């Protein structure tokens, strides 16, 4: 039987085959069961993870195995169409598996010894972060810290499963422990610093802005009407700045600014 795949569907499936074959080889080498991620990681047609269905499939499948190898970063729709997570999606796969088997801890082995206080490409020899909360990690991951996929915390967080980021090349390092909360006094006042490119700022100034009820809502409504998501909105007494993604704003800049400048 030959199945013909065309366009992006073929590209997505092709991208997953290396991981699939690597999993097959690893399972054979270790003598473990091989579980194809396409059979247990469920996506909808739009490429969104179906978390509840995935958890059911994983729990049922893994309850029959003492040891198993599961390829990362891809899954499939109910009809077998292969879908993938975004870059680094194997972290999410590991988190989903940890939740399904009610693991005591999710060890994520990578090529660095956990998170650092700041980017080593900018700051020389930054200090490692020994422990960090899920919330702090979520902020750092979204703003550019790429050690762990930003969505990997959700499955394990609900179950209270800690994550330990470890270094494959330096297994003796303790890495970074990610938990719901920590009573340990941090070494530094600031947990970490990360940055993300590709934003632009719209600065708005108006006298007595702070006393005008609904002004901020009216401004943000303009962006919503144009289909532009905002990232951050710092404000002062007479000033307001809206940070948006540059690629979303460029084609709609003039129309957005016209609506913002219109008297209300």
Protein language model annotation of sequence segments:
Residues 140-178, 193-208:
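A conserved active-site cap/scaffold subdomain adjacent to cofactor or substrate pockets
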Residues 35-37, 71-72, 109, 150, ...:
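Generic beta-strand/beta-sheet core signal
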Residues 7-9, 13-153:
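Nucleotide/pyrophosphate-binding catalytic subdomain
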Residues 174-261:
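A conserved regulatory-domain signal marking ACT and ACT-like small-molecule sensing domains
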Residues 2-3, 84, 90-93, 110, ...:
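Ser/Thr-centric signal marking residues that sit
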Residues 1-7, 12, 258-264:
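Single conserved hydrophobic/aromatic residue that forms the stacking wall/gate
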């Amino acid at each position: 039987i030959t199945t013909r795949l065309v366009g992006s569907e073929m590209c997505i499936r092709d991208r997953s085959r290396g991981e699939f074959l690597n999993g097959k080889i690893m399972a054979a080498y270790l003598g473990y069961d091989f579980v194809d991620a396409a059979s247990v990681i469920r996506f909808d047609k739009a490429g969104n993870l179906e978390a509840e269905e995935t958890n059911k499939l994983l729990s049922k499948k893994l309850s029959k195995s003492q040891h198993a190898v599961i390829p990362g970063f891809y899954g499939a729709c109910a009809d077998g169409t292969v879908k993938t997570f975004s870059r680094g999606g194997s972290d999410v796969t590991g988190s989903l598996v940890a939740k399904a088997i009610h693991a005591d801890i999710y060890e994520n082995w990578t090529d660095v010894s956990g998170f650092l206080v700041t980017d080593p490409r900018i700051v020389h020899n930054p200090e490692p972060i020994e422990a960090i909360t899920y919330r702090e990690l979520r902020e750092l991951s979204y703003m550019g810290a790429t050690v762990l996929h930003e969505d990997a915390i959700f499955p394990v967080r609900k179950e209270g499963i800690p994550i330990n980021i470890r270094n494959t090349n330096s297994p003796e390092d303790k890495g970074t422990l990610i938990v719901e909360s920590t009573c340990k006094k941090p070494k530094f006042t600031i947990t970490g610093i990360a940055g993300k490119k590709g934003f632009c700022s719209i600065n708005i100034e108006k006298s007595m802005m702070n006393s005008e009820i609904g002004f901020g809502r009216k401004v943000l409504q303009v962006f919503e009407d144009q289909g532009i998501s905002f990232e951050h909105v710092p404000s002062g007494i007479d000033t307001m700045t809206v940070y948006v993604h540059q690629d979303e704003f460029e084609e709609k800049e003039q129309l957005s600014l016209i609506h913002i400048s219109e008297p209300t």
